[in-house]
C-alpha cells in the first residue's frame, strides 16, 4: 500500500489540473527509488493503474533507458509479451526513451538519485527541469538514505530546489516500512528535514494501521449445528 499512498494524491492533483484546464506538459512529480529493481517492480503496478488515465504521462529515466525511441521500442518488445507470446507495445502515455522524455517530459518521472544527479548536469536534460511545474518529490525506502548516500542525496535535494521554479510549493513524501513507533517521531522529523532541507510537521507522519473485520468468535458449537452441517454436506455429495 505504500505505492498507492503517494500515487493516488499525485493522480488526484493531475486530474484536478485537467478539470481546471491547466494540465499542460511538464513534470509534476519525481519519484525516486534507491534501486532500478524496485522501480521496475513498481512499474508493473503503475502500468496497470495508469492505463485508466491516458491523459497522465509517465516514464522511467535510469541507466537502462535507451536514448532513441527506436531502440527503446525494440527493447520493450524483447521484454514484454502478451498471453500468446507476442510482443506488446507500450501504452501511449508511457514514455520509454530519453529523446522523447527530453522533448516532452512526463507528468510523473521515475528515476534514482544517481541518475537524477546526472540529469541535472547534462544540457540535454535541461527541459526536464526548466519546464517542470513540480508539486511532488517522493523518496521511496527513505531509510536507505543514510551515511554517505544520505549526505549526497541531501545535497541533491537542495540543488534540485534551487533548480526548479516555485520550490516552496513542492510537497515531499518519504516512505519506509521501518518508521518505528510514536516515540521515534522526533528522530523521524529530524531525519526528514536534514534529508530534504525543508520543515516537516509531526502531523505529517502517517503510519499504517491494521484493521480486521469484526467477527463473532464461535468457541462453542452446539452438537445440533454440527449435525445440520453434516447433513448439508451429505445432501450436496449425494446430489453430485
Language model feature labels by segment:
Residues 4-21:
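Walker A/P-loop NTP-binding motif
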Residues 27-48:
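Conserved Walker A/P-loop ATP-binding site and its immediately adjacent core
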Residues 235-240:
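Conserved small/polar residues in nucleotide/adenosyl-binding loops
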Residues 90-107, 114-132:
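Conserved helix/coil segment N-terminal to the catalytic DExD/H
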Residues 147-205:
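Post-DEXD/H (motif II) to motif III coupling segment of the RecA-like Helicase ATP-binding lobe
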Residues 105-108, 134-135, 169-173:
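Loop/turn-to-beta-strand initiation segments
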Residues 61-68:
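Conserved helicase motor
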Residues 128-157:
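SF2 helicase catalytic motif II
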Amino acid at each position: 500500500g505504500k505505492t498507492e499512498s503517494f500515487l493516488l494524491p499525485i493522480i488526484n492533483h493531475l486530474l484536478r489540473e485537467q478539470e481546471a484546464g491547466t494540465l499542460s506538459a511538464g513534470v509534476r512529480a519525481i519519484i525516486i527509488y534507491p534501486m532500478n529493481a524496485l522501480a521496475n517492480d513498481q512499474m508493473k503496478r503503475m502500468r496497470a493503474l495508469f492505463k485508466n488515465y491516458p491523459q497522465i504521462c509517465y516514464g522511467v529515466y535510469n541507466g537502462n533507458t535507451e536514448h532513441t525511441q527506436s531502440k527503446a521500442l525494440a527493447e520493450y518488445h524483447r521484454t514484454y509479451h502478451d498471453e500468446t507470446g507476442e510482443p506488446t507495445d507500450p501504452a501511449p502515455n508511457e514514455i520509454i526513451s530519453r529523446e522523447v522524455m527530453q522533448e516532452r517530459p512526463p507528468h510523473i518521472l521515475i528515476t534514482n538519485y544517481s541518475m537524477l544527479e546526472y540529469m541535472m548536469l547534462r544540457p540535454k536534460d535541461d527541459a526536464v527541469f526548466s519546464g517542470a511545474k513540480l508539486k511532488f518529490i517522493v523518496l521511496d525506502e527513505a531509510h536507505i538514505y543514510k551515511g554517505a548516500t544520505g549526505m549526497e542525496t541531501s545535497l541533491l535535494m537542495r540543488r534540485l530546489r534551487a533548480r526548479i521554479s516555485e520550490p516552496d510549493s513542492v510537497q515531499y513524501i518519504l516512505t519506509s516500512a521501518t518508521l518505528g513507533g510514536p516515540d521515534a517521531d522526533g528522530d523521524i522529523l529530524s531525519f526528514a528535514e536534514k534529508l530534504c532541507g525543508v520543515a516537516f510537521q509531526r502531523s505529517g507522519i502517517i503510519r499504517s494501521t491494521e484493521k480486521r473485520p469484526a467477527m463473532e468468535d464461535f468457541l462453542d458449537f452446539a452438537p445440533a449445528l454440527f449435525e445440520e452441517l453434516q447433513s448439508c454436506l451429505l445432501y450436496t455429495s449425494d446430489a453430485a
